[in-house]
Design a protein with these regions (language model features):
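Single, function-defining residue in the core of a domain
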Residues: 1-46, 53, 57, 75, ...
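Major-groove recognition helix of helix-turn-helix-like DNA-binding domains
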Residues: 61-74
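Acidic-basic catalytic patches of nuclease active cores, encompassing PD-(D/E)XK
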Residues: 90
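An active-site-proximal beta-strand-loop segment
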Residues: 100-113
Length: 366
């Protein structure tokens, strides 16, 4: 159990920082946000009653549960607010951005989130998102809207590249990104036309692990781009169109996996986003914003902890824990037992991640 004085101190500390970053919000509102954020971290749940169990207040459990509900129902916490809180975590220089979508069902409701974020610490930190009103693919206008909004806070000079999967294609979309000065690294479908030739005809008889590229840029959805292909160990042909060099295209595209790690840490393997009973777009968006703050903090603490004490490895050589789990363990111990180490972890929320290293690779053409 958290000592009441420690709980109040920790919530007040975070609320004061949030007030610095978000001066247009009321201090008491931000304190509730801080309390709910701490509750989510400790409960690993998005159910109101489970979050309420970890909030120390002189009130009945039912009253605290209603307070948690009001935080999601009434607090006008926008994606832009979350982005403003997370900006100090971004290292200087050019950054790699990833766009993807995650969806699930709640009864008869399709819950569908389009997410744009930055690749750091082995995950993608969400900086902007939109709750889609259906269960299918994203519309081009929604993608363009997210990018345009984020460009207001992070100009194109900070964007090294935007990575996306096969869903995120189209002539207008490719033209928009080029017009904004954003380099693209986007997987394309096998039936995509490269000049006048279907992509699958241009890359026949690929062997697993083999990499091939066109000898010169070709027209892809109205844009001249490099196209690189490989065959996965499972036998799936992977074709990527990009504005990067041949030998950097696939290396960069592999970073798209980071957003799968994000969704995993937010959903069943982490904070359990899918447990929520909320389906209204505004409330779901606020919940996702709080989970984004929690994830960023967990990963930042996990990165710091790994520098002090590397993550143990299992027999197959993979890490025993993700950076998010590694950081959450320390955060929860500090919150639960009122430890002063909380303030060390709190300072990490205000300090940038290490600049992502870029592995060099040798150019190979086929």
């Amino acid at each position: 159990m958290i000592r009441p004085s420690a709980a109040r101190s920790h919530a007040d500390t975070l609320a004061e920082y949030l007030k610095e970053r978000l001066p247009h919000h009321r201090r008491d509102t931000l304190r509730r946000v801080a309390e709910v954020l701490f509750g989510i971290l400790q409960a690993e749940s998005t159910l109101h009653r489970k979050i309420a169990l970890h909030i120390e207040r002189e009130a009945t459990p039912a009253s605290i549960t209603r307070m948690v509900a009001r935080t999601f129902h009434e607090t006008n916490l926008t994606p832009q607010d979350v982005c403003d809180v997370l900006l100090p975590l971004l290292p200087p220089g050019r950054l790699t951005f990833v766009m993807d979508r995650t969806n699930w069902k709640l009864g008869q409701h399709d819950l569908n989130l389009l997410v744009l974020g930055v690749a750091l610490g082995g995950v993608v930190l969400p900086l902007n998102w939109k709750v889609l009103p259906h269960g299918g693919s994203s519309e081009m206008r929604a993608r363009m809207f997210l990018v345009a909004q984020l460009l207001e806070r992070l100009p194109a000079s900070r964007w090294a590249v935007l990575i996306a999967d096969r869903e995120f294609v189209g002539e207008e979309w490719f033209s928009f990104l080029r017009g904004q000065g954003i380099k693209r690294c986007i997987r394309i479908r096998e039936n995509t036309q490269l000049d006048a030739l279907p992509a699958h005809d241009a890359f026949q008889n690929l062997k697993p692990g083999e990499v091939r590229a066109v000898f010169e840029d070709v027209m892809v959805y109205g844009s001249l781009m490099q196209v690189v292909a490989t065959l996965s160990p499972q036998g799936e042909r992977v074709l990527v169109a990009s504005d990067l060099s041949v030998w950097d295209t696939l290396t960069t595209y592999r970073l798209r996996w980071n957003i799968e790690c994000t969704f995993s840490a937010m959903k069943t393997r982490g904070l359990n986003l899918e447990q929520t009973h909320m389906h209204r777009p505004d409330r779901l968006s606020r919940l996702f914003g709080l989970l984004s703050l929690a994830l960023a903090w967990m990963v930042r603490v996990g990165e710091w902890r790994a520098e002090q004490q590397p993550v143990p490895k299992k027999k197959h050589g993979r890490p025993a824990w993700s950076r998010a789990s590694y950081g959450r363990e320390l955060l929860c111990a500090a919150l639960r037992w009122g430890r002063t180490t909380f303030y060390t972890h709190f300072e990490l929320l205000k300090s940038p991640f290490s600049a992502p290293g870029r592995k060099k690779s040798q150019p190979v053409r086929y």
